[in-house]
Design a protein with these regions (language model features):
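Conserved PLP-binding catalytic core of the aspartate aminotransferase-like
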Residues: 214-245
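Active-site phosphate-binding strand-loop segment of PLP-dependent enzymes
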Residues: 39, 50-106
């Protein structure tokens, strides 16, 4: 358990694991790009693949990448909150550990930890209040950090003291315990949580695919279960939609400035009823005469 969020892990990962002086990074969105930029301060952070060419609306084919067999690790961000994408396959290179930022998808479904050298995540999406990060690290990767690595940036420091080298983020740890018990005792485990989350996402994606007013830009295969992005025909309509949605009780739907449009984050805590209510609102908004007027005008301009 670490104070701070996953952004601190962007530095801790290379400080602890970049023993060969280089690592491979797959950039599938904003946070994986930031992680690569931070790692470049400590060695060669090679971007071996990126989906920037299509504004991160897909995940690079992990089986078609030329990995460096001398890389200390391969780094990915497994779910991309801003762009609404998620990995469906994992890079697996013999002798090269996989490091994954799972901040926005941890505990949403089962994870085979044996495929990873390190999993880290900020807790604020599915685990606990903001202010803490958690790392799961394979034993053989520990203890190789240089002596110059700051004490609190060394994984072994906290591991040796059961995460209590200094005063730990007690409230976040306590809340994590409650959430884990809830997932096990009330939900019935991560297999059931996955079914619930996939059902929620299916409701929203099925609606988006069944009409013409709103549009989801992500390639179907890589659509995120946690973050559903969509746009209306024009940016001015996006702004108007978000304002009316807020008045109706649907808050924080505005998409990130890098993407625009809207984003519905449907993490574990969002009940199915919330997604159904959002779809009902989308249907009513889409059916407004003014919406169709804007849609037709946009189509006319597009074909001029």
């Amino acid at each position: 358990f670490f104070q701070g969020g996953a952004t601190q892990q962007f530095a801790m990962v290379p400080l602890n694991f970049m023993t060969t002086g280089k690592a491979d990074y797959i950039v599938s969105g904003n946070f994986s790009g930031l992680a690569a930029k931070e790692a470049a301060k400590f060695g060669e952070a090679k971007i071996v693949a990126s989906s920037k060419d299509k504004n991160f609306t897909y995940i690079p084919d992990v089986n078609a990448i030329d990995y460096d067999k001398d890389a200390s690790y391969i780094h990915i961000c497994q779910n991309n909150t801003i762009f609404g994408t998620q990995y469906v396959e994992l890079p697996q290179v013999e002798g090269v550990p996989l490091v994954a930022d799972m901040s926005s998808m941890i505990l949403s479904k089962p994870v085979d930890v044996s495929k990873y050298g390190c999993i880290y995540f900020g807790v604020q999406k599915n685990v606990a209040p903001a202010g803490m990060a958690i790392a799961i690290v394979r034993d053989d990767l520990l203890g190789h950090a240089a002596d110059t690595v700051p004490t609190m940036m060394n994984y072994t420091t906290l591991l040796a003291k059961d995460s209590m080298y200094n005063t730990p983020p007690c409230w976040c740890i306590y809340m994590t315990g409650l959430v884990l018990k809830y997932l096990e005792n009330d939900i019935g485990g991560l297999e059931n949580m996955q079914k619930i989350n996939e059902a929620k996402a299916r409701i929203l994606y099925d609606y988006l695919d069944g009409q013409e007013f709103f549009h989801n830009p992500v390639e179907h295969r890589y659509r995120s279960t946690m973050n559903v992005t969509f746009t209306s025909p024009a940016p001015d309509m996006d702004k108007k939609f978000c304002a009316e949605a807020a008045e109706a009780g649907f808050v924080n739907l505005k998409g990130h400035r890098l993407v625009g449009g809207m984003r519905a984050s449907i993490y574990n805590a969002m009940p199915k009823e919330g997604v159904v209510a959002l779809v009902d609102f989308l249907k009513k908004y889409e059916a407004k005469p003014v919406s169709y007027t804007h849609l037709r005008a946009h189509e006319t301009l597009r074909h001029l």
